[in-house]
Amino acid sequence: MLDDNPLYLLQVPQRRIEQMLEERAAELGVEIRRGHELTGFTQDADGVSLQVGGPAGPYTIRTRYLVGADGGHSVVRKLAGIAFPGVTTDTTIARTAHAAVPAGLVDPATGGLDLPGYGPIPPFLHHRTERGLFVYAPLPGAPAPLISTMEWNQQDAEGPLTLAELEASARRVLGVPIALGPPGGEGPHLLRKLNGGNTRLAERFRDGRVLLVGDAAHVHSAIGGPGLNLGLQDAVNLGWKLAAEARGTAPAGLLDTYESERRPVAERVVMSSRAQSALIAPGSEVTGLRALFTELLADPRNVRRIAELMSGADVRYEVGDGHPLAGRWAPDLELKDGRRLAELARDGRPHLIDFTGGDWGHPAAAGLPGSAAPCTVPCTALLVRPDGYVAWATDVAEPDAASRASLQAALRRGLG
């Protein structure tokens, strides 16, 4: 079944994702306040009292829980006194900008570049040379292609990044000139320079009624782009558990599983991002390592393993069930009525998937708070959590007393 869960890359700009999330939040009645700053908080057994500075002056908010989703410089994390150990490097300079390139350099067949004296540069890939890294990314809807370079142990020019500085960097990395012009359109236009980088992981993701998600809990290299998925999965994992707490249906310890499930995943992503950062660096030693990895990736099993690591499909939570699918990402199954499992997941509820056409939904799931919504597809049975992970699975075709009891235990243990 896991083979039927296709994984692929979607080239969606982050600003578009943020726009969609904001629109959905507004549909659900969420009030989004901009220009407001958290200045302090205190917590007790019943909730958290926030001190906030706003355009009209300071005010307070009382809430049951506080979630810090405020980025790598998280004020919530700092005020909570949660340590953020890790490493800071100062050996790289990354330059990125929207910039126009001469039309004659663009290969219409590939969408990449074909530079005289150098050759083809595929789009969207990290193009490594012995002098650095170059990326050409003609993102759909962008005002101009995104041009990026990264150099190691290079003296930084003082002041903000300019197109002339980026052009000079690209020439050093590629060894040939490439003319860069200002982007067209109204923007927003990116022009950014980053010196060094941080790889850090919060010592803990929870302090009483204060919780951290996304970059507030972990920062790392953007190589491979795992950060967005990691942060969204944090939010979804925490979201349904907080909802159960708010409804009063959460079993004891459910909220504690947020950290026990998500922090190991973040540790693995940090490890992966550091490995990828090492593999893009210049140098003959790295070139040798890359040659070895190329040989290893000739084996489709290794390709799959890396793909699952990058996508997060290799994550398996400890859910107290010994079935091979338990704790794994549920495959996006097609149901008998033509809908897919991913469509059902939008309602934020658990779902009991009956592959046999039997009566797994009765009575084990009946009468429980937040009980699963039965669906039928031709196979055995899965209980899928609101975040899309399998809470329980069985190979038993006909429900018996033992299997019904295990399903009921899974419902109470993980879903309230």
Label the model's feature ranges.
Residues 1-4, 19-29, 43, 168-172, ...:
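Helical substrate-recognition/capping region of FAD-dependent monooxygenase/halogenase enzymes
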Residues 1-290, 294-297:
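Core Rossmann-like FAD-binding/catalytic domain of the broad FAD-dependent monooxygenase superfamily
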